[in-house]
């Protein structure tokens, strides 16, 4: 069986220290290879044409040409490359713009290796599926869209909720084998129960989480939560 080709990644980041950390993170993962690095949007455009990467890990806030204008130029010129955005901002305006330009994912600085790993793993699944299948079934499309649903819900968060924290809660819910209470989830992610409950209530309101009541032998029932299936 032929070995699958590595996914070619270009890193565009103006902070040398962050650039090196990102490089080390990506190189920890099988299936990916770094084909180039650059610190500016202008040089990034040159290297994108020259190296023809499959994926760009793109910093949004850079001097001269920032990431948003870089993405706009890429889309206007119909350059065939996917982008994962890296940003210090989690305001809805920036996130809406990134989503409209078709980024595959966005990572809010500072992010963990586990968060980047999750983003790249999801991207690799989509990338391999697109390579193998000339046409996608409805089930395949549904699964891909479902995976991006968590990102889409961050498009318009209520006041006081933050995309990075919401992502933490969602990631913990994805790991659960059985429903858990807000207190248990909060303990797992290092957040107060009342804080976690606000995010769980939001996820329930947008149809992404199911809440159920668990009755013990005494006392009031406990609200437990799990991701909605299907």
Curated annotation (Swiss-Prot):
A single cellular component GO annotation: cytoplasm
Broad class of where this protein is predominantly found: cytoplasm
InterPro entries (alphabetical): 2C-system_Tx_regulators, CheY-like_superfamily, Sig_transdc_resp-reg_cit/mal, Sig_transdc_resp-reg_receiver, WH-like_DNA-bd_sf, WH_DNA-bd_sf
Subcellular location: Cytoplasm
Modification 4-aspartylphosphate, positions: 59
Post-translational modification (record): Phosphorylated by DctS.
SUPFAM superfamilies referenced in this protein's UniProt entry, alphabetically: CheY-like, Winged helix' DNA-binding domain
GO molecular function, one term: DNA binding
Response regulatory domain mapped to chain residues: 8-124
Entry keywords, A to Z: Activator, Cytoplasm, DNA-binding, Phosphoprotein, Transcription, Transcription regulation, Two-component regulatory system
The keyword Lipid metabolism is assigned to this record: no
DNA-binding region coordinates: 183-209
Function: Member of the two-component regulatory system DctS/DctR. Essential for expression of DctP.
Name assigned to this protein: Probable C4-dicarboxylate response regulator DctR
Gene behind this protein: dctR
